């Protein structure tokens, strides 16, 4: 055995490890910056420039790198955040229970991993599951007091959301009053969305108005990129009249809390809602 050769081999291995370590840190920083940029476009401006699939790929790559290199994981990483803080034009509402976002499973392996974790958490190998359509819109919290809609807020950063009560009151499909046998106080959560037909009609109206604007030498308005952006932008308008003019609907999928006894399972809750 040649000690000098051993020293050279160890040095080479150490150098290679340092290079990989440095490359991982740089990639993590790059991914965080990129994801934060696209989050601002998505949440604040409602104008994303990449697809949900592309964003998911970036997010998943960052998450895997942080799992592999936990020394680089920090509290301000996008993987540790939910949404963005509320914008200043709206007053802030603190969520009684945090509004969290959903995780994704892209393939059969992802579903099996989720199933295994759920079985471990519940300590049950066999359990019933409820499957629901994922409607892509704006997550909303509705609080009812004495049977009347009292507050509506966005998810925001998961802990604090924007008070959009006046805007949400203009949406015809959002119940303003509940049945007399409802709990005195409760919070439900759901998604405010725009149907594909409504989205197409809205963009057609914008195109027609743009022709008039262009004839008078005024700047044309941008079309909406997708129904999700159109719905989110409509709810977060400073003028409730604009919200009222948009073809919005709501799908309620969760009872967050109530001051009375409520159904014991999610399936029973959905039927009750």
Model-derived segments and spans:
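RNA/tRNA-interacting regions in translation and RNA-turnover enzymes
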Residues: 2-273
């Amino acid at each position: 055995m040649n000690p000098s050769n051993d020293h050279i081999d160890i040095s080479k291995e150490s150098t290679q490890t340092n290079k990989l370590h440095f490359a991982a840190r740089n990639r993590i920083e790059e991914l965080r910056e990129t994801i934060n940029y696209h989050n601002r476009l998505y949440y604040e401006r409602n104008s994303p420039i990449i697809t949900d699939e592309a964003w998911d790929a970036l997010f998943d790559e960052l998450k895997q790198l942080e799992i592999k290199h936990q020394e680089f994981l920090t509290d301000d990483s996008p993987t540790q955040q939910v949404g963005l803080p509320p914008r200043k034009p709206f007053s802030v509402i603190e969520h009684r229970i945090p509004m969290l976002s959903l995780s994704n499973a892209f393939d059969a392996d992802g579903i099996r991993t989720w199933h295994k974790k759920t079985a471990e958490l519940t300590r049950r190998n066999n359990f019933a599951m409820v499957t629901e359509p994922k409607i892509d819109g704006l997550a909303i919290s509705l609080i009812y007091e004495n049977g009347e809609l009292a507050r509506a807020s966005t998810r925001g950063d998961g802990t604090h959301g924007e008070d959009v009560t006046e805007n949400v009151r203009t949406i015809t499909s959002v119940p303003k009053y509940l049945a007399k046998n409802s709990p005195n106080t409760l919070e439900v959560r759901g998604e405010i969305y725009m149907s594909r037909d409504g989205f197409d009609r809205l963009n057609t109206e914008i195109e027609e108005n743009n022709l008039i604007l262009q004839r008078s030498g005024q700047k044309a308005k941008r079309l909406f990129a997708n129904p999700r952006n159109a719905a989110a932008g409509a709810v977060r308008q400073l003028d409730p009249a604009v919200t009222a003019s948009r073809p919005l609907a709501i799908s309620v999928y969760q009872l967050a809390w109530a001051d009375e006894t409520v159904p014991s399972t999610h399936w029973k809750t959905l039927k009750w809602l």
